[in-house]
Swiss-Prot record:
Protein name: Probable chemoreceptor glutamine deamidase CheD
Keywords, in A-Z order: Chemotaxis, Hydrolase
One Pfam family here: CheD
This protein's record includes keyword Transport: no
Source organism of this protein record: Halorhodospira halophila (strain DSM 244 / SL1) (Ectothiorhodospira halophila (strain DSM 244 / SL1))
Protein's job: Probably deamidates glutamine residues to glutamate on methyl-accepting chemotaxis receptors (MCPs), playing an important role in chemotaxis.
Class of enzymatic activity (EC top level): hydrolase
Family: Belongs to the CheD family.
Species lineage: Bacteria, Pseudomonadati, Pseudomonadota, Gammaproteobacteria, Chromatiales
NCBIfam families per UniProt: PRK13487.1 (NF010013)
């Protein structure tokens, strides 16, 4: 989004980093900060004083930042179910589920590193993976297992998590400070979240994993 393209009560949304112009960004009066709202399949990275927001059902989000520079971001993804045993993604590094999860994590981490972040300074927080989508397969559990395994295998520093349960949750992340808030949505089943994630799951089950990402 270009400077001056959107105004809210006289506040101009500043330029974002290249490649994130499609992300919905706005002024959040409660926190007095600009916010970027990401949807399933999206990610966002910033080096400024911004808040990244998403609502998770069975999907998971990884919040990653360089703790010294304050550069960081958040993704929002789930593993596709098609191909192999839907209850066991692990054990096959070439499986569709593993490759999709790796891509979701690596595109986020690579952008942080490209902005000057150092791998040894990265810290991670994980959210989501609720049992929200109906079906025999516990999609949320699979997503949690992948995210935790990825962080462990890559030797990343996991400093916080809010995972599992039966409710959707709203997550707010402030990469500059590393602060994160997770609020469970207890009062409603939140059909919007469920429909959005069901549509996303159908899309990723139908589409091939796009591109190979090498972690540097």
């Amino acid at each position: 989004m270009q400077l001056g393209a959107f105004r809210n009560r006289g506040v101009t949304v500043p330029d974002c980093l290249p490649g994130f112009g499609h992300i919905n960004r706005y002024w959040d009066p409660e926190h007095q900060v600009f916010a970027a709202k990401i949807l399933p399949g999206e990610f966002y990275v910033t080096r400024g004083n911004e808040m990244i927001v998403t609502t998770l059902g069975s999907c998971v989000s990884a919040c990653v930042r360089d703790r010294r520079l304050g550069v960081g971001g958040m993704n929002h993804f789930m593993l596709p179910v098609r191909g192999g045993d839907p209850n066991h993604w692990e054990g096959d590094p070439l499986s569709t589920a593993t490759r999709y999860g790796n891509h979701a994590m690596e595109q986020l981490i690579n952008r942080v590193l490209a902005l000057g972040g150092q791998r040894q300074e990265l810290e991670v927080k994980l959210f989501g993976g609720g049992r929200v989508l109906a079906g025999v397969t516990d999609v949320g559990k699979r997503n949690i297992e992948f995210a935790e395994s990825y962080v462990r295998t890559e030797g990343l520093r996991l400093i916080g998590r809010d995972l599992g349960g039966q409710y959707p949750r709203k997550v707010q992340y402030f990469p500059e400070s590393g602060r994160a808030r997770s609020k469970k949505l207890l009062r409603t089943r939140n059909d919007t979240v469920v429909r959005r994630e069901e549509h996303y799951l159908h899309e990723i089950d139908e589409q091939p994993v796009s591109g190979d990402v090498d972690l540097f």
